[in-house]
UniProtKB/Swiss-Prot annotation:
Its main location: nucleus. Residues 264-276 have a biased composition (Low complexity). This is AT-rich binding protein. It is found in: Nucleus. It comes from Sarcophaga peregrina (Flesh fly).
Amino acid sequence: MGFPRIISKNNKIYTKLGAFCLSGDGQQFWIVCHTCQEELQTQDKFWKHIQDEHNFMHGPKQEQGRTAAQAYMEAAEAAAMTPLPLYRKVSENDQQRDDVVSTEDEDMQKEPKDYTEMRAHDDQQQTAAVAIDIKLEPSSLSQQSAVQAQQQQQQQQQQQQQQQQQQQQQEQLQQQQQQQQTQQIEITTPLMYQIPQVHPPVSAYAALVQAPAINTLNMSVAAAAAAVASNQVPSTMANLLPQELQYKQELQYKQEVQQHKESTNNSTTASASSAMSSDDGERFYICDFENCGLKFKYHSRLELHRSVHSKVRRFACEICGASFKQSCNLSTHRKKKHALKGTTKATLVPSQSF
């Protein structure tokens, strides 16, 4: 028959009536009674001891009607209300360790208490000092706040004045720039429109250098007088026109001259030299290059065919300068390479007659 026990640390089994203690090597054991602190060597002896000496599970003769559970609960309540110190066999080393740990715990508990007391004392001193300052110098504090407010107002006023000055300066600069731009436009616009509109039968360079008539309607009085007095309109024009504009004007002049020649001569020379009539009365054009002799129904087809012999590409791209034999090839090139749509004026290279 056993008894209730609870396993815990330090090789001990605690019950509500006794403690089961082991030796350090775990070979010897003893049981200590909680009620009378008597040491017993076996569990049977301890069980008999608590039954005989302390009436556990039996009770006195006049209380035979009580159950064992009631007796156990009464004994447990009595032990809980008046707990007795446990008997322990502790070595000297364990005792020293316990003393050191207990002293360290006490020091750790004292330190926060001392720190809190010091903080409370410092807070009290600070509050007292602030109260003294408020009592002694209330006027000085109000004066300082008033001075600070005045300084802030002055700084704000200065900043506003600086911003206004900067805005005025910017407006003046913008007005000056606009005036300068208008003056430059008045001086340069009449000179830019003095390009000759009629091409004389001379070279392109002579046409550019020839002095045009000075238009003084759109010029100011001072600018017109300066232009008439200096008589340097051709040189200023040459300086104003860039090289690209001169090159384009030369090409346009040559193209117009060539087109005029072709329009006047194609109807006579082409028909006279290469136009033939068949037996059926149908008119056709024959290529007269060496031994070619190909026949074409239209003169435009003959001109395209002649570019094969002359290796001249009449249609040139105005963006990249690539040249083509036919206008359709130029249009496809412009769509694919430059993503341009629609028809524009293509740069025509004059055809060579042979």
